[in-house]
């Protein structure tokens, strides 16, 4: 159960990080 929650949070964090990189370009 805990692993599932962490995976969901990581996926959202990864998506936000990708957007920041595109904006920097």
UniProtKB/Swiss-Prot annotation:
Statement: the UniProt record of this protein carries the keyword Ribonucleoprotein: yes
Keyword terms: Ribonucleoprotein, Ribosomal protein
InterPro entries with a match to the protein in the record: Ribosomal_eS32 (IPR007836)
Miscellaneous comment: Initially thought to be part of the large ribosomal subunit. Crystal structures show eS32/eL41 to be a small ribosomal subunit forming a bridge at the interface of the 2 subunits.
MF annotations from Gene Ontology: structural constituent of ribosome
Top-level lineage group: Eukaryota
One GO CC annotation: ribonucleoprotein complex
Native organism: Quercus suber (Cork oak)
Presence of the UniProt keyword Cytoplasm in the record: no
Gene Ontology biological process terms in this record: translation
Complex formation: Component of the small ribosomal subunit.
Pfam families, alphabetized: Ribosomal_L41
Location of region: Disordered: 1-25
Identification of the protein by name: Small ribosomal subunit protein eS32
Family the UniProt entry places it in: Belongs to the eukaryotic ribosomal protein eS32 family.
């Amino acid at each position: 159960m805990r692993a599932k929650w962490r995976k969901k949070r990581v996926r959202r964090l990864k998506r936000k990080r990708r957007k920041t990189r595109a904006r920097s370009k």
